[in-house]
Amino acid sequence: MAHFTDKLVLGAWMLEQFGVETLETFKGLLADPNLVGFDEENTSLFHYELINKPFRARAMSDDTLRLYDENIVRHWRRITERRNQAGSTLYPLYFQYLALLFTEHYLDRYFTDRATLCADLNAFREQFNTDLPEREQIEPFQERDLNKLAIWIATGGGKTLIMQVNILQFQHYLARARRAREFNRTILLTPNEGLSLQHKEELDLAGIHGDLFVKDGGSLLSAGAVEIIDIHKLKEKSGEVTVAVEAFESNNLVLVDEGHRGAGGEDWMAKRNQLCDNGFSFEYSATFGQAIKAASGSELAPTRAGQSPSKRYKLVQQYARCILFDYSYKFFHADGYGKDHLILNLKEEQLAEQRQLYLSACLLAFYQQKRLFADRHKALLPYLLANPLWIFVGGKVTAKNEANAETVSDIHAILQFLARFLANRGGESVEFLELLLTQRDDLRDERDRRIFGKAFPYVQTAWATSQARELFQDLLQVVFRAAAPGLLHVVHLKGGGTGEIGLRVGENDWFGVINVGDAAKLIKQLDADRDSNMVVTDQTYATSLFERINKPDSTINLLVGAKKFTEGWSSWRVSTM
């Protein structure tokens, strides 16, 4: 069976429009870091490469390419003007530029002659299908469906910047076609309220007027604003805090951020389709592939007459014809971006007995980042690195179940580790650091290889093998903001509606914060545990530690939480997960 990425017919057609077959060809031409930027004539350096090294059969002239580039540069300068006031000038990277270039060409064709565009796409589709098995072939493009585009881009790839330029690109081509009066609103759909708030802040930075939806709050009357609403507030009928889809009418520009994560697939798609009926939509996601896999049924076309196709088949057909640009994680990571996964595969029999030593090694790896950031701060300035932050994302918050009364939640287990490390009873933590410093820890994988053998080069340069105690003292100061070992204070912060749990050693500054949906329940479980290394209390505290994490004066080095904070939250600080 062909892979889903091999069925992206719209993306393949767009590559052919520029005379290439794969994204890698573009990468070879444009990925040089020296090509990032604009010249004194407000032309991108990428443009000169595209003009000077034309591919075998480009569908547009040099003059058209220049117009596309002028539009991209103009829009980019607008959305980054305020952002650049922070001190660093933002320019599009090659894959961001290509996403915008592809959008330029598509919108140009779409608003010039939609019927001819549809005919050209179907002519290409016929040839494209010859490489696919019969039951996996792509169904014909329909003119009525050409108003839906999707951008597949990995998390961290600049999706928000691309979306904001797409708004300006669409407005430009709409005005050129003299159809601006035909469109009612620009609506941005998000999967949750947290992401709505984040988009509001990002639109403000871009100089684009955005309004959060407030039931009966007048936001629908803000002329020209991007109206931001999470998908759960759209219903068939209006309620106390919800609004009927029909209240927004049709003929809208609809922007969808991770739509399939906010509601059931068919549910949100029906709402999106109603909103953009006779309008247009852009959809953005890092996880189109996962959405396809999660859908039920087969990717193959039905074999019997009258048999309904599966949800998965319908999703494949839809996205194959609307994903304009694929820069999913495999491309992102191959370019040196994203996360480096360290899959350690500790021997199963070692996992329980050596958990404390294993997590101490994880802590030491984070300390190494903090120490390096402090020691080499000036040298690291050009790389725009932020103060390192360690995060734990737990799958379970509280977990006492009937099957196993001793079950400990992920978050509870992390707190037990921290409390035991900070207590250093019998010098255990110092002993563990010495084992790691001297490479005598004996933590091995299933192939009997030392899993932390090359993990601490900077620590081993900074500290002699005999200095484990001094290393422990410095680690306490750098990570935990403490001068000496002590009890872990787990404090339920009441007041201000934060629902957070603060972490500190004794009465020292906060070094960590727990952000979960039910803080009171977790506190109750911790209190019942009676851990001798942990003090569980509560305190009236109006300021949110979580919301201040990105502030320069934040003392927080550790963030522990569940899914609550993974959506609608962004931080350049995250360096260890």
Short names for language-model regions:
Residues F102-L107, T160-R179:
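Walker A/P-loop NTP-binding motif
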Residues D204-G239:
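Inter-Walker segment of RecA-like/P-loop motor cores
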Residues P54-W152:
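Conserved pre-motif I regulatory segment
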Residues A123-E126, I162-H172, I228, H232-L381, ...:
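Signature of the SF2 helicase/ATPase Hel1-core->accessory helical subdomain module
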Residues L161-I162, A177-L205:
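Conserved Walker A/P-loop ATP-binding site and its immediately adjacent core
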Residues G156:
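Walker A (P-loop) phosphate-binding loop of P-loop NTPases
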Residues T89, C118, F141-Q142, A180, ...:
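Conserved C-terminal RecA-like helicase domain
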Residues M1-S88:
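Extended, charged/polar low-complexity intrinsically disordered regions
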